Amino acid sequence: MARTVQCVYLGKEAEGLDFQLYPGELGKRIFDTISKEAWGEWQKKQTMLINEKKLNMMNMDHRKLLEEQMQLFLFEGKDVQIEGYVPPKPE
């Protein structure tokens, strides 16, 4: 049986993550309150951020920026803003 969580991002009960994907207290908070679906949405945004801003995960400043954006996205509902990105128009 799948583990469920009250997802703060989706605002509803949904299937939870299978294991803690992020270290520390923040990782525990994500595991306890973020669903697989919400984590998948974050991963798409994270990929865009890394690519568009040319972030280097070996750089601590870049890692800090990504973590801040992750918290804003998952827990405060703020979308990731990428300068110059225009989403494709639906067909």
UniProtKB/Swiss-Prot annotation:
One biological process term from GO is: cellular response to oxidative stress
What one GO molecular function would you report for this record?
iron ion binding
Name the domain of life this protein comes from.
Answer: Bacteria
Instruction: State the GO CC annotations.
Output: cytosol
Its biological purpose is as follows: Could be a mediator in iron transactions between iron acquisition and iron-requiring processes, such as synthesis and/or repair of Fe-S clusters in biosynthetic enzymes.
Assigned keywords, A-Z:
Iron
Family named by the database record: Belongs to the Fe(2+)-trafficking protein family.
List the InterPro entries hit by this protein, alphabetically.
Fe_traffick_prot_YggX (IPR007457), Fe_traffick_prot_YggX_sf (IPR036766)
Protein name, UniProt field: Probable Fe(2+)-trafficking protein
